[in-house]
Amino acid sequence: MALSAEDRALVRALWKKLGSNVGVYTTEALERTFLAFPATKTYFSHLDLSPGSSQVRAHGQKVADALSLAVERLDDLPHALSALSHLHACQLRVDPASFQLLGHCLLVTLARHYPGDFSPALQASLDKFLSHVISALASEYR
């Protein structure tokens, strides 16, 4: 399902509100993913995965940067995320289901920090946005 103008506006407005804290929330979502879905740790065996570790924060910032790029380039997600898709599919060989798990944990994290803003409309728009991001990231797997 395509992102409507309202979806785009809601996602962009939330991203603007998150500001410089995007990396904090993506790091928390990554930590939440590791706790809730321990199999996702498989791809990070070379990192210190303890909560708050500098390595998890660094990867959380990479996730934040990728999502911020996606928000900026909503009209061309497959092209904007093609290098990341190739990296995850061909070099890192990450199971694309892990992207869905991280997306779910990001929704939970954002809802926890912004309960007053997290309306059903915003949740639906973010879910659609993350679905499009996940689809773009999984494109090299086909």
From Swiss-Prot:
**GO molecular function list:** haptoglobin binding; heme binding; iron ion binding; organic acid binding; oxygen binding; oxygen carrier activity; peroxidase activity
Pfam families to which the protein is assigned, alphabetical: Globin (PF00042)
List of residues binding heme b: 59, 88
Tell me where in this chain the Globin domain is found: 2-142
**GO aspect biological process, one term:** hydrogen peroxide catabolic process
Source organism superkingdom:
Eukaryota
Q: Which GO terms describe its cellular component?
A: blood microparticle; haptoglobin-hemoglobin complex; hemoglobin complex
SUPFAM superfamilies with a match to the protein in the record: Globin-like
> Does the record bear DNA-binding in its keywords?
no
What UniProt keywords are attached to this protein's entry? Heme, Iron, Metal-binding, Oxygen transport, Transport
Transmembrane helix found in the keyword field: no
> Which InterPro entries does this one have?
Globin, Globin-like_sf, Globin/Proto, Hemoglobin_a-typ, Hemoglobin_oxygen_transport, Hemoglobin_pi
Q: Which residues form the signal peptide?
A: none
UniProt similarity note: Belongs to the globin family.
Could you identify this protein by its name?
Hemoglobin subunit theta-1
